[in-house]
Regions:
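Feature captures the catalytic ectodomains and active-site-proximal regions of enzymes
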Residues: 1-261
């Protein structure tokens, strides 16, 4: 399996630049329309496309394991993609699929509609995250604690499910800056009544960093402080048996428009 993300590429001299790794925030409906077209028209390769969430989806291909890992598109904002494309005979099928997808997407009615509305079009797919299915020990068995996850991220959801951690759906949770913070906090407080550990993932500011949007990133951080950290701190102060830890898993720079090492 590989991650199959719809992206927006922009021509630049003799290369194509990764403009938007979300392809203009595709809706799930738009994405499913694209996936159906790819599945119907790429019939000469053993591939199956599975819908995920918006721009982020899965492609399964019958092949030997790849020896090289492919770069995530959100690490390539503003970069020419040529040097990051799959290289070598083992990737011939992937290159073919990407090229075919670009042709199919160029003529797709949804993309034509987005262009008329001056929206970024999903003019390519980006394949990455290749690997074998991993296994994790059950979290509760290993640590003796029950846990649940609140996150719109399919990556976090997948890891949680692999470890036997419950995944809680939240209405209005998008994984971006317009996510419903209030519902996420309310759900976290409810989960604390039945679980030893609740992992609440908030990633709205990350996307804004990768678009170089400093002003909105600051506003989103302020929202996280007032709508997430504040209410949770107040609730936890009423329960002496609960502690809160705030952590980051990586740093994304709105100045460099990429992740910082």
């Amino acid at each position: 399996p590989l991650c199959c993300d719809f992206v927006t590429l922009q021509p630049s001299h003799n290369d194509m630049v990764m403009k938007d790794y979300t392809a203009g925030h595709l809706s799930c409906e738009e994405s499913r329309n694209y996936l159906k077209a790819l599945q119907d028209q790429i019939s000469d390769r053993q591939v199956t496309f599975y819908p995920g969430l918006g721009f982020h989806n899965i492609m399964v291909i019958q092949s030997r394991p790849f020896t090289k890992f492919l770069t995530p598109p959100n690490e390539l904002i503003g970069e020419g993609i040529r040097k990051f494309m799959p290289d070598g005979d083992e990737f011939n099928d992937l290159i073919y699929i990407i090229n075919q997808a670009q042709i199919i997407l160029h003529n797709h009615p949804v993309n034509q509609k987005r262009k008329r509305e001056n929206l970024d079009s999903a003019n390519s797919i980006w394949l990455w995250g290749n690997g074998k299915k991993g296994t994790l020990p059950p979290f509760e068995k290993k640590f003796g604690k029950s846990a649940s996850l609140i996150s719109a991220s399919l990556l976090f959801q997948g890891m949680a499910k692999a470890a036997g951690i419950g995944v809680v759906s939240v209405k209005g949770a998008t994984g971006f800056s317009e996510t419903n913070f209030d519902n996420k906090v309310e759900t976290a407080i409810h989960e604390l009544q039945n679980k030893d550990i609740v992992y609440l993932n908030v990633a709205g500011a990350e996307e804004l960093s990768l678009k170089g949007n400093i002003d909105d990133k600051i506003l989103t951080i302020e929202d996280i402080d007032s709508k997430v950290i504040g209410p949770l701190s107040k609730e936890i102060s009423l329960n002496s048996g609960v502690k809160m830890m705030v952590v980051v898993n990586h740093v994304s720079s709105a100045v460099a428009v990429k992740y910082e090492n």
